[in-house]
Amino acid sequence: MRRALVPLVAALVLIAPESAAIAIGPPDPGDVKPQIVWKKIPFGATRKRQMARYSERHYGERTYHLTDPQVVVEHYTDGTSFDSAWNHFAANGTHLGEKPGVCAHFLIDTDGTIYQLVNLRIRCRHAIGMNWTAIGIEHVGTSADAILGDRDMMRASLRLTVWLMSRYGISWGNVIGHAETLQSPFHEELYDDWRCMTHADFNRGEMRIFRRRLKRVAGRLDVPIGAGPHWVDSGC
């Protein structure tokens, strides 16, 4: 009986590596998810209706739902206080004559703590032309240089962004700065007066640094990075 087991054991040893190789694939998004603290802003029925109407006016679709996001937009708050930014997003104030007020899905504090403010199934008004398909990440700070030079904030931001890439299949080329939105192939704005509006936070040069680091972190975590940036002429 013992002699009969020897060929069987040898066969299993030969089969095991091939089976293991077949099982290798992208990591489970939960395996790369960083620690996130929930600190929800009010986003009840009224704000959802406002977001749905905003979407109808600007994107031609009456919904507040964010489905299959294709882009991550990086921002900074142009301030030094987490509480000030959170309160501004929570207030749901009128912006450019319209509601809902501005917000972002995530807000990263200066100590590197990641706060989630809004459910990822809900559209947030954080970047003109992009809210229909983009997740917004805000960083507490007054310049991209300061954030890029802050180890705690960068570690948190890169891990968060890589997790979102893994979860939604977003390519590294569609991780963009607010200042790059007009050249994104996903930019869509029905209001002519708004079509060329954007902000200056995280410009092309700053995002080259960010994306270079992002690829390194994604590589270490075995997260597929997809295609690089594909810019379009906005005509602006």
Identify the function of each model-found stretch.
Residues 24-47, 143-236:
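Basic/polar, cationic surfaces and motifs that engage anionic cell-wall
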Residues 121, 136-149:
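Substrate-binding clefts and substrate-entry loops adjacent to catalytic sites
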Residues 20-128, 235:
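N-terminal catalytic cores of peptidoglycan-degrading enzymes
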Residues 73, 105, 136-138, 176:
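Soluble periplasmic/extracytoplasmic beta-strand elements of cell-envelope proteins
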Residues 129-136, 206:
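A structural motif
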Residues 7-16:
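Bacterial N-terminal signal peptides
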Residues 67, 99, 130, 146-154:
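Solvent-exposed, acidic/flexible segments
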